Amino acid sequence: MTIILGIDPGSRVTGYGLIKESDRKIAYIDSGCIRTSNDVELSHKLLQIYDGICELMDHYSPTEVAIEQIFMHNNPNSALKLGHARGVAMVAAASHRVKICEYSAREIKQSVVGYGAAEKDQVSHMVVELLQLNRAPQKDAADALAIAICHSHMRNGLSKLIGSRGTKRRRMRL
């Protein structure tokens, strides 16, 4: 059995999602958000993210961690803050000596929905379906679960099937 922690980093809200994988089947464990205080300096926000990820690592002992890669923001300051949040989340996971994999937003959407330009609500819907949840999790938690699901698919080669099927469809339309 593999426990995967998906992380959707953010300087204000960092989403997390935990799934377990056994015999190529996935199941929901937990999800939520690490919310940082508005009234503290960036360094303290980063410490809150670090502590939150470490707490999850200690409590659930995931064997693998997946995190979203940075995408370009229109605002360079936002991109830098996101990079800091992502960095401390990765350091927190690395301090527990687990494998960390990174995925682009397009890879995550392609793996979970089957379409790399899918909308957020489509991703959330598929997270609910794939994990057989009663309701959609919070936005950042749903994104983190999608990252964990993507990692499960990637490590089992399922994304290659999804990607090749999508390519064939595009070729047939030409």
Swiss-Prot record:
Mg(2+) 1 binds at residues 8, 140. InterPro entries: RNaseH-like_sf, RNaseH_sf, X-over_junc_endoDNase_Mg_BS, X-over_junc_endoDNase_RuvC. Its cofactor is Mg(2+). It is found in: Cytoplasm. GO terms for molecular function: crossover junction DNA endonuclease activity; DNA binding; magnesium ion binding. GO terms for cellular component: cytoplasm; Holliday junction resolvase complex. Binds 2 Mg(2+) ion per subunit. It catalyses: Endonucleolytic cleavage at a junction such as a reciprocal single-stranded crossover between two homologous DNA duplexes (Holliday junction). Mg(2+) 2 binds at residue 68. GO terms for biological process: DNA recombination; DNA repair. The keyword DNA-binding applies. The active site is at 8, 68, 140. Its EC number is 3.1.21.10. Keywords: Cytoplasm, DNA damage, DNA recombination, DNA repair, DNA-binding, Endonuclease, Hydrolase, Magnesium, Metal-binding, Nuclease. Belongs to the RuvC family. NCBIfam families: PRK00039.2-1, ruvC. The RuvA-RuvB-RuvC complex processes Holliday junction (HJ) DNA during genetic recombination and DNA repair. Endonuclease that resolves HJ intermediates. Cleaves cruciform DNA by making single-stranded nicks across the HJ at symmetrical positions within the homologous arms, yielding a 5'-phosphate and a 3'-hydroxyl group; requires a central core of homology in the junction. The consensus cleavage sequence is 5'-(A/T)TT(C/G)-3'. Cleavage occurs on the 3'-side of the TT dinucleotide at the point of strand exchange. Homodimer which binds Holliday junction (HJ) DNA. The HJ becomes 2-fold symmetrical on binding to RuvC with unstacked arms; it has a different conformation from HJ DNA in complex with RuvA. In the full resolvosome a probable DNA-RuvA(4)-RuvB(12)-RuvC(2) complex forms which resolves the HJ. This is Crossover junction endodeoxyribonuclease RuvC. It comes from Legionella pneumophila (strain Lens). The lineage of its organism: Bacteria, Pseudomonadati, Pseudomonadota, Gammaproteobacteria, Legionellales.
